[in-house]
Amino acid sequence: MSETSVVLSHPAPHVLQVAINRPEAKNAIDEKTRVALIDAITTGLNDTDVRALLLCGTNGIFCAGGDLASMREMTEQAARTRMQSGHHLIKLLWHANIPIVVAMEKFAIGAGAGLALVADHIVAGENTRMRFPFLQLGLVPDWG
């Protein structure tokens, strides 16, 4: 299990890289990761030295979407809170006053695809796939 669900770095001057880091779960987003993403992106957007934000995944994978294992035993209130924080994350990116770039590898599924589509620019590997499996899972499209 990765110690830090989100890794921050500065690959170039004035660029904040926010990497989803849950390789054991194909970078699926659980509550801890969602909160860490919101915190990291908020910090980056409030930093006047940051002029662009790069969102990516570690270990050659962008994001497998929401962590289904963490949703199985979720109460109605927890599900509502999850949806609200997911919407907050999307709104942060949508209303950002700096360019948001998503670098995708392998796949962006469900909520991961939603994160990618809200970006200003997407850079995707040749074999990258986007998928929206909500209906097959009995879910509604949720993050945007």
Q: Can you describe what each PLM-predicted range is?
A:
Residues 1-58, 91:
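Conserved CoA-thioester-binding segment of acyl-CoA-metabolizing enzymes
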Residues 3, 49, 57-92, 108:
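Glycine- (often His-adjacent) and acidic-residue-rich active-site loop
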Residues 18, 55, 67, 115-117:
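Hydrophobic/aromatic residues within transmembrane alpha-helices
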Residues 21, 66, 105, 127:
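Histidine-centered beta-alpha loop that forms part of the nucleotide-sugar donor binding/catalytic region
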Residues 47, 96-97:
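Acidic-histidine catalytic/liganding microenvironments
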